[in-house]
Amino acid sequence: MKLRSFPVKIFAMAIAMGSLWSCQTKEAAKDIIQDNVDNAVAQLTLQTDIIEKSGKFLNPRTYENGKMNYVPIDDWCSGFFPGTLWYTYKLTGDKKWETLAAKYTEQLDSVKHLKWHHDVGFMIGSSYLNGLLLDGKEEYKPVIIEAAKSLSTRFRKGAGIIQSWNVDKGTWQAERGWTCPVIIDNMMNLELLFEATRLSGDSTYYNIAVSHANTTLKNHFREDNSCYHVIDYNPETGEVLHKHTAQGYAHETAWARGQVWALYGYTMCYRYTKDERYLEQAQKVYDFIFNHPNLPKDLVPYW
């Protein structure tokens, strides 16, 4: 009987040790998450203290060449700082961050009228939309809808897409020879349109978002499911004029950040539409990224 019970005891010990290891692993994961939250809070505390003491409205974008880089409200990254504050409030529950998030969000009010580039979705989505979704700020709804109207003015019906950048004479975009450039980043702005339809009941925004997603699905991707950065269109006919990059290494390379814009963008489009094609494309982009032989072991891709 003792010999027979020995394997049972070993098995029981293994289960107990496995449970202990599992608990320790979960606790370690919690510690990592909390450590990161604490670090973010410390950095944001330092930065908001600097800004508040300055008496100015400053919008930090990045730390570069030994100093903080602040940007005007029409910069495409202007919504990221208030967005970070909203997430910090959500993670900590500290009302201090709610107050600061609202303050820096509402400094961007005039962005709702911005029509000269497509990134109003980034700017208002990260700030006002997060305020609504994370904190129930109902008073932000009109700003979100107005911003969607502004973004919709960039829709080129003949091509079925939202034009990303203007090509005014003298701009670097014009010097590239583009007519109606659309960048993969634009997929990120569609969430603003989907939300505007949900909030207003006006399907115009939804239809523009779907048209843009479908046209991008058709033209932006290579056979291996990597994507180009820039597709240049004839805005009247939808003819593809150029397949280029603006920030990648070369036209036929897969710019790392752009692949993630595509992955997030089509996952988000599936969430709003339940169109299986979008989910399938997101999976294909995921497979391209994570099965790529040049992806480093730390999973941080080269530029």
Q: Residue spans of the language-model regions?
A:
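Bacterial Sec-dependent N-terminal signal peptides
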Residues: M1-D31
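Glycan-recognition and catalytic cores of secretory/periplasmic carbohydrate-active enzymes
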Residues: K26-W303
